[in-house]
């Protein structure tokens, strides 16, 4: 195996150099060829970090000493135990750098807007994007605000020391290969770098731009179409995360909620035409897309083809989901399960740690570059997270005038735009000036012929989400958990909670902006009338604790019931995973079957709930028109008729249904978008509200279609306004079916028995740095974007990036798995050692028997700390 990997690595390096030559990459971007290929110091002379095993030592820092025991195990975990807390975090920093330095360094450089300093001018738009998000300023403010006597500061301080101790020890043999290719030696790590990774993650989890295309919809489409296509609350029945009864009738037929007015365009600045405004919106959309494209088309991306993990971080529009739930067994035991759906790479975006110190024994997964454990459990509590997906990004159009250059009209007076003067160092060029313009309600992202669009995001204010997880790591009860949760403000999550005392709950606390006018789903007038007036008070924020159903769940569906008194957003996942989880939990709870086995059954479930809504109407339509079907179409009908809705790799019906559902959705809505001149520049085909690639599992259109198909099959929206054809649901379903069979015959051949799902639907673990030869897979895969065991798209590198199940009555029995491995070094046996378990639906016992006794501290009565 080692020889094969050396061959792959050699081919990868050769490919890098050939691509560089063929693309005429500027020589200043790369290290000199002789240095890269030098047998003594180049890529050939690289050694992997240590493999599996345990060792003990005494660590001395600043005249303080601590006993340390470290175990690296083949289940994807690094285990650290010490008699001093500071030593645990120092060692975590050192070992994270040893196994993941390039990964964490590139994430931090990117988010600080410094990637051009290593890569060159091709990624300058990406750096400008993150400078526009004010990342350098925000991270500095966070560091300046830290309480230097706090537990969280101590953890961050010693973690940073540990990272830098490793960087200082770097030799040519241990230098990451990507650094050698680029001729780069890392600078010392800073606390700001850690918070930059925090900002990267919070933007990925909360950044959105749906308001931009929705504004175009409001301007181009009449009110009755907006009302039908984009209801303020989902048109189909959903199980909200927090089904609490509040004030009745909030989302009423007028769309009013707390003074808001949905479905009508917001006021425009004086003298601005609709067309000028639309062109400015299109420019704002292009701002995001250009930042994303700049990275994908950069030198790094060309040298390392296929790099995509950063793509979602840049544009912030990725809609990967997640699942979590908590449930009580008949004896009152609290179970927790969690599987966040993020990019699946090698190395993983996660790194597994068990951290043991005075009063602490926590195990779970962490983001490289951040101290502590992000998701996991300790002997007292367990927690997991899904993205709550509320709206925390708002857009405004400023009132400007040629008579007041450099100013905007706000709250009755003209005010100057604040200018933040940036200098971005670009490799091979030097310093490039870049100005960021700020108004009272956000940063300028587009200025088209005097039409100025600004964005306000809660993440542009200094908050310390990392403190949340450090306090979770040491929490021993609900009160201490809520203390940690109080620090989590941006990138709001549905935090699932279970403890050894039988408490269960889900909490979505954070900064929810309140506005008092207009339609916040669209760009609003920036004259001060529609600004944030505060945030939803904590006591009214969504949560559920010890529900009478004995379970609670979240899967990125709508947060609240329609009578919740505050606006929290409107573009969520479509709720089908949540519906399936609710169905299964209800069954298992009624059976008294809340066990590890039943929780695994739910996590690995591949039933697409949309088949409960669409399959029978399709079969009814086909059965009444069998005489019009071709022999192959009849064969496809028979396969669908006998199908259970499970997306297994060997299912042919799954393939037919998947393509049919896409065509049915497209055939219903695309004529209307064409009729009202919705264009790609407006976001057509990119955003879920305009038939983007996630539209069958995210956003309102698929819910509209389910509602109309089952309840209003003759509704006017099935008509084709372009041709004038009068249609109903049956006609469109048959049209989509005919298109699907023709498409599959063209793609897969004339024999439907060979159209099995695993033939066209695969999982791949892409190399984090995009070296295709070092990716893992692809593998035929079950599931789709609507199944609990999710695999988005046809070549999926998004899905359950971490699976956790724990019974808090016996937390030592907790199980989990993530794909990939500890090491980013491709020749290491720890590069890909957990993938087979993950692919096969298997789990590791997180704290297995046979470890040194220190790792059972706080679990077993006789276990002690080292020293």
Residue locations for each model-derived region?
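Charged, long alpha-helical assembly modules
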Residues: 659-751
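Gly/Pro-rich active-site capping loops and adjacent beta-alpha segments
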Residues: 78, 82, 86-126, 130-131, ...
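Glycine- and hydrophobic-rich flexible loops that cap the catalytic core of alpha/beta enzyme folds
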Residues: 357, 362-367, 376-380, 385-529
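Hydrophobic alpha-helical segments
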Residues: 488-588, 646, 661-665, 671
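Proteins synthesized as precursors that undergo proteolytic processing into mature forms
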Residues: 125, 136-138, 160-161, 459-496, ...
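Terminal end segments
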Residues: 27, 34, 291, 567-634, ...
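Substrate-recognition/specificity elements adjacent to catalytic centers across diverse enzyme folds
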Residues: 8-14, 19-334, 340
């Amino acid at each position: 195996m080692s020889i094969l990997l050396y061959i792959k690595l050699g081919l990868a390096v050769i490919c890098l150099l050939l691509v560089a030559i063929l693309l005429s990459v500027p020589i200043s971007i790369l290290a000199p060829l002789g240095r890269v290929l030098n047998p003594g110091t180049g890529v050939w002379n690289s050694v992997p970090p240590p493999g599996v095993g345990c060792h003990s030592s005494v660590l001395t820092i600043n005249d303080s000493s601590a006993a340390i025991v470290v175990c690296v195990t083949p289940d994807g975990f690094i285990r650290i135990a010490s008699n001093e807390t500071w030593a645990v975090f120092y060692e975590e920093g050192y070992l994270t750098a040893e196994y993941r330095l390039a990964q964490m360094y590139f994430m931090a450089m990117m988010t600080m807007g410094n990637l051009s300093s290593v890569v060159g001018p091709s990624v300058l738009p990406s750096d400008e994007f993150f400078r526009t998000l004010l990342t350098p300023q925000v991270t500095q403010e966070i560091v300046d605000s830290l309480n230097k006597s706090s537990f969280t500061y101590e953890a961050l301080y010693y973690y940073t020391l540990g990272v830098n101790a490793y960087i200082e020890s770097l030799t040519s043999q241990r230098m990451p290969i990507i650094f050698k290719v680029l001729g780069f030696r890392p600078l010392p790590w800073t606390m700001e770098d850690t918070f930059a990774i925090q900002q990267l993650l919070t933007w990925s989890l909360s950044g959105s731009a749906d308001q931009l295309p929705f504004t175009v919809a409001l301007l181009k489409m009449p009110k009755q179409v907006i009302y039908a296509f984009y209801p303020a609350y989902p048109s189909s029945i959903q199980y909200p995360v927090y089904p609490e009864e509040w004030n009745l009738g909030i989302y009423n037929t007028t769309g009013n909620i707390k003074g808001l007015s949905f479905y009508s365009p917001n006021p425009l600045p004086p003298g601005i035409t609709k067309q000028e405004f639309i062109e400015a919106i299109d420019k704002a959309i292009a701002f995001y897309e250009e930042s994303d494209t700049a990275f994908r088309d950069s030198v790094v991306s060309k040298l390392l083809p296929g790099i995509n993990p950063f793509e979602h971080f840049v544009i912030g529009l990725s809609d990967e989901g997640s699942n979590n739930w908590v449930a009580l067994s008949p004896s009152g035991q609290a179970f927790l399960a969690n599987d966040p759906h993020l990019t699946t790479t090698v190395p993983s975006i996660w790194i597994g740690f068990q951290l043991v110190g005075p009063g602490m024994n926590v195990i779970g997964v962490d983001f490289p570059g951040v101290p502590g454990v992000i998701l996991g459990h300790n002997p007292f509590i367990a927690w997991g997270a899904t993205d709550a997906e509320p709206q925390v990004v708002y857009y405004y159009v400023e009132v400007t005038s040629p008579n007041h250059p450099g100013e905007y009209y706000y709250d009755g007076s003209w005010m100057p735009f604040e200018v933040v003067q940036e200098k971005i160092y670009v490799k091979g060029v030097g310093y490039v000036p870049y100005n960021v313009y700020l108004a009272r309600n956000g940063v300028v992202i587009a200025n088209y012929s005097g039409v100025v669009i600004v964005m306000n995001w809660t993440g542009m204010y200094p908050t310390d989400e990392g403190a949340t997880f450090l306090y979770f790591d040491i929490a021993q009860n609900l009160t201490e958990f809520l203390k940690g949760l109080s620090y989590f403000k941006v990138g709001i999550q549905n935090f699932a909670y279970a403890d050894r005392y039988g408490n269960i709950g889900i909490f979505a606390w954070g900064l929810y902006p309140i506005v008092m006018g207009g339609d916040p789903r669209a760009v609003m007038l920036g004259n001060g009338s529609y600004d944030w007036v505060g945030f939803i008070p904590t006591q009214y924020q969504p949560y559920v604790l010890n529900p009478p159903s004995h379970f609670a769940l979240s899967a990125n569906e709508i947060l609240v019931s329609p009578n919740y008194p505050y606006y929290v957003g409107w573009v969520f996942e479509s709720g089908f995973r949540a519906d399936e989880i609710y169905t299964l939990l209800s069954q298992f709870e009624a059976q008294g079957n809340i066990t590890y086995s039943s929780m695994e059954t739910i996590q690995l479930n591949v039933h697409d709930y949309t088949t409960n809504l669409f399959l029978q109407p399709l079969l009814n339509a086909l059965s009444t028109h069998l005489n019009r079907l071709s022999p192959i179409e009849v064969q496809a009908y028979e396969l669908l008729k006998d199908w259970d809705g499970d997306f297994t790799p060997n299912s042919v019906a799954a393939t037919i249904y998947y393509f049919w559902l896409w065509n049915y959705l497209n055939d219903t809505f695309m004529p209307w978008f064409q009729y009202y001149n919705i264009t790609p520049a407006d976001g057509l085909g990119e955003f879920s509200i305009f038939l983007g690639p996630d539209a069958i599992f995210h956003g309102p259109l698929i819910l509209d279609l389910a509602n109309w198909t089952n309840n209003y099959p003759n509704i006017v929206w099935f008509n084709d306004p372009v041709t004038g054809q009068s249609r109903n649901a049956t006609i469109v379903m048959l049209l989509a079916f005919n298109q699907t069979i023709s498409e599959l015959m063209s793609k897969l051949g004339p024999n439907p028995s060979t159209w099995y799902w695993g033939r066209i639907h695969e999982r791949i673990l892409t190399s984090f740095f995009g070296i295709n030869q070092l990716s893992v897979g692809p593998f035929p895969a079950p599931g789709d974007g609507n199944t609990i065991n999710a695999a988005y798209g046809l070549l999926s590198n998004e899905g359950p990036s971490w699976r956790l199940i724990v019974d808090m009555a016996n937390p030592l029995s907790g199980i989990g798995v993530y794909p990939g491995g500890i090491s980013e070094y491709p020749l290491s046996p720890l590069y890909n050692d957990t993938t087979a378990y993950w692919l096969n639906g298997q789990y590791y016992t997180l704290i297995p028997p046979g470890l040194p006794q220190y790792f059972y501290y706080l679990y077993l009565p006789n276990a002690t700390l080292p020293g």
